Swiss-Prot record:
Segments forming domain Toprim: 140-216
Protein name, entry field: DNA gyrase subunit B
Miscellaneous information on this protein: Few gyrases are as efficient as E.coli at forming negative supercoils. Not all organisms have 2 type II topoisomerases; in organisms with a single type II topoisomerase this enzyme also has to decatenate newly replicated chromosomes.
UniProt keyword annotations, A-Z: ATP-binding, Cytoplasm, DNA-binding, Isomerase, Nucleotide-binding, Topoisomerase
Organism, scientific name: Acinetobacter sp. (strain ATCC 33308 / BD413 ErpE27)
Principal EC category: isomerase
Entry GO terms, CC: cytoplasm
Main location: cytoplasm
Gene Ontology terms, MF aspect: ATP binding; DNA binding; DNA topoisomerase type II (double strand cut, ATP-hydrolyzing) activity
Amino acid sequence: SHKVSGGLHGVGVSVVNALSSKLQLTIHRAGQIHEQEYQHGDPQYPLKVVGETSTTGTTVRFWPSGDTFSQTIFNVDILARRLRELSFLNAGVKIVLRDERVNFEHIYAYEGGLSEKSALDIAGLPGKLADCQEKDPALSELYLVEGDSPGGSAKQGRNRKMQAILPLKGKILNVERARFDKMISSQEVGTLITALGCGIGREEYNPDKLRYHKII
């Protein structure tokens, strides 16, 4: 069921190794080239020095195990979506996707990361937000209402001093299951992020900037 990961966070190459019939590591570090090979998760020899280098970096090559996967052909569309998400999250990192089967290459690089994503307009509050007069987040409440009609009724019956109303169109996207790029391109999600005021992403998110301490 896991299309782009082994299912766990923070395990990296160990999961890839366990799911591969063969894995090769080539490490450029401290002027030396180190190499090690695994087959079905087992090391074939200790890490060894095979040459000299003036660069740094690591190359990982792996062959998915036919004993684990019914199909071992890589789907470039799935890889492209995942790498695009990673490029949004890691500003300044260049990721190159190359498919030598069809002579395809694409480079993903977002210098500003999420801060440049046009889907999130953080210049001002959403137009449909009926904000409250209270400026202290601890005393402010935000009510999320489905649809414009219920939103209008809620605006009329609210306490303007401490209650804000934000109408959202239909059922909001399930962000727990959605791809990251699809999530931040959703107008309703973008509106909600802007209204809350605490941003999104590793560099931008700050819970201290949350504008409402009670959200209903």
